[in-house]
């Protein structure tokens, strides 16, 4: 066990500033109106720094810097851009513990996740896109013996990115790495609930990028996010967050006819066929862990497996074993490497989760385990903690809506057809899980479930080279994978005639 000292205390490996301005043109720039907002840590509920409360004027300053940088950056060779991305990855790796601690303190998630998942994944995404942009090729087509069509990938120019609060650094890197690799300049707005871990990161890597290529402006959605998303000075907007806000982002983008990438809500089914209990072996243990994945990152994952579907003939036995597994999840200080589940990202989210739990109880859903706020005592008593909670009910209950917390709603199904029917009975289609020892069943279920990613005999893996995105109301476009480069590029066609004679029309 390792317990990290809190930022700013004796023996701490990093400290936050007491106040953060915006990062514009590789400099710290105070908000135009001089306003700041408090930023509490979810670990204790206490404020630890103040952050720029930006407005449209600050967005304009960032756009000025981005537009000044975009032409030269877009013409930088892909080899040079790849070198810079790899340098960013190296610098992050050298400072992994510091960045992980900042992320855990700002967001509340266990440091074992930031040390072993979030930040290493972010590092790998930079390295992946450094390689992907080097490997990307244009094309040519021979129209006839004298005419050739050449196709080039060109950057869009200046793009806007709005980042969620559940994975502040990793979700930022999902967007930053391909956008930078493709040669775009960026104005990025973090979530106001988790505004500073990305600023700690930029303090580490900022000097590696030319001034103005990456600009970070903090603030609230209406005051800063809307001016960015609706600006006629951006060529694309990428957003991760709730579906309601995603609709607004689309409206703003439509006014300027610019493309959007939207990664929105989810209520992912996790389907367990009866053969998962065919033997008491490693696979069974893996499936039980797969059930408990609803509590990863405190359930604050768009693809959290928050609807568990268990086949009738194993329902009672599997649920009893899953409840034991859930009760064994260790909740505690997020800075302790033995802690498995930490704090919710904000007090508002805490209250939302608790209200849904009460709704579930009122609707008649049965609490198998959890169902209350976690009172950890001591200096954690003001933090935002919820017990991992397992409900049983049916798919029509409100607890089967997106809660975005460590809550799973469990129901049963008779056969394959009913499993698919229940799994698809949702507005969302971001992720899903299928568990079966029968490869044919697992494959068919994966194809029949309406979701952009279906984990099969696994869950919550997010490699850089696997496409991620939603069906239905879970979003538009994809993130990660080589195909993501095209989301930040436009195609230039040069149609060239090498003939000496006129075409003969006039």
Swiss-Prot record:
Active site: 263, 302
Protein residues bound to NAD(+): 219-225
Induction line: By EPTC (S-ethyl dipropylcarbamothioate).
Record Gene3D superfamilies: Aldehyde Dehydrogenase, Chain A, domain 1, Aldehyde Dehydrogenase, Chain A, domain 2
Domain of life from the UniProt record: Bacteria
GO molecular function: aldehyde dehydrogenase (NAD+) activity
Top EC class of this enzyme: oxidoreductase
Keyword flag NAD: yes
Matches recorded under Pfam families: Aldedh
Catalysed reaction equations from the record: an aldehyde + NAD(+) + H2O = a carboxylate + NADH + 2 H(+)
InterPro entries (alphabetical): Ald_DH/histidinol_DH, Ald_DH_C, Ald_DH_CS_CYS, Ald_DH_CS_GLU, Ald_DH_N, Aldehyde_DH_dom
PROSITE patterns: ALDEHYDE_DEHYDR_CYS, ALDEHYDE_DEHYDR_GLU
Keywords on record: NAD, Oxidoreductase
Protein's name in the database: EPTC-inducible aldehyde dehydrogenase
């Amino acid at each position: 066990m390792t317990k990290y000292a809190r930022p700013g205390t004796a023996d701490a490996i990093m400290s936050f500033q007491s106040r953060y301005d915006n990062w514009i043109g590789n400099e710290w720039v105070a908000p135009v109106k001089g306003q700041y907002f408090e930023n509490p840590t979810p670990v204790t509920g206490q404020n630890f720094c103040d952050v720029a409360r930006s407005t449209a004027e600050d967005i304009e300053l960032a756009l000025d810097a981005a537009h000044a940088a975009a032409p030269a950056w877009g013409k930088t060779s892909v080899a040079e851009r790849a070198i810079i991305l790899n340098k960013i990855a190296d610098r992050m790796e050298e400072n992994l513990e510091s960045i992980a601690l900042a992320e855990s303190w700002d967001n509340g998630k266990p440091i074992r996740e930031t040390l072993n998942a979030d930040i290493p994944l972010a590092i790998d995404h930079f390295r992946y896109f450094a390689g992907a942009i080097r490997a990307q090729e244009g094309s040519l087509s021979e129209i006839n013996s004298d005419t050739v069509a050449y196709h080039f990938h060109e950057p869009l120019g200046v793009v806007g990115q709005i980042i969620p609060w559940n994975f502040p650094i990793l979700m930022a890197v999902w967007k930053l790495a391909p956008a930078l690799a493709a040669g775009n300049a960026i104005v990025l707005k973090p979530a106001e609930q988790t505004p500073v871990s990305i600023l700690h990161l930029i303090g580490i890597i900022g000097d590696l990028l030319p001034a103005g290529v990456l600009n970070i402006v903090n603030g609230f959605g209406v005051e800063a996010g809307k001016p960015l998303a609706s600006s006629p000075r951006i060529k694309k907007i990428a957003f991760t967050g709730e579906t309601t806000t995603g609709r607004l982002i689309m409206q703003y983008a439509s006014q300027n006819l610019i493309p959007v990438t939207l990664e929105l809500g989810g209520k992912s089914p996790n389907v367990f066929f009866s053969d998962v209990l065919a033997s008491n072996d490693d696979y069974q243990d893996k499936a039980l862990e797969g059930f408990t994945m609803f509590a990863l990152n405190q359930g604050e994952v768009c693809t959290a497996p928050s609807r568990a579907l268990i086949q009738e003939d194993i329902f009672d036995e599997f649920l009893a074993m899953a409840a034991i597994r859930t009760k064994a999840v260790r909740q505690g200080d997020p800075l302790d490497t033995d802690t498995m589940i930490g704090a919710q990202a904000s007090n508002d989210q805490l209250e939302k989760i608790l209200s849904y739990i009460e709704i579930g109880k009122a609707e008649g859903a049965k609490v198998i385990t959890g169902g209350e706020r976690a009172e950890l005592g001591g200096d954690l008593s003001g933090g935002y903690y919820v017990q991992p909670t397992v409900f049983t009910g049916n798919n029509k209950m409100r607890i089967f809506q997106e809660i975005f917390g460590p809550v799973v709603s469990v129901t049963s199904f008779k056969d394959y057809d009913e499993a698919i029917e229940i799994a698809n009975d949702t507005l969302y289609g971001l992720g899903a899980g299928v568990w079966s020892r029968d490869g044919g069943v697992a494959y068919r279920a994966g194809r029949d479930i309406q979701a952009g990613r279906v984990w099969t005999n696994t869950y919550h893996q997010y490699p850089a080279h696997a496409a991620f995105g939603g069906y239905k109301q879970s979003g538009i476009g994809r993130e990660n994978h080589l195909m993501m480069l095209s989301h930040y590029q436009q195609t230039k066609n040069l149609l060239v005639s090498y003939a000496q004679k006129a075409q003969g029309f006039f």
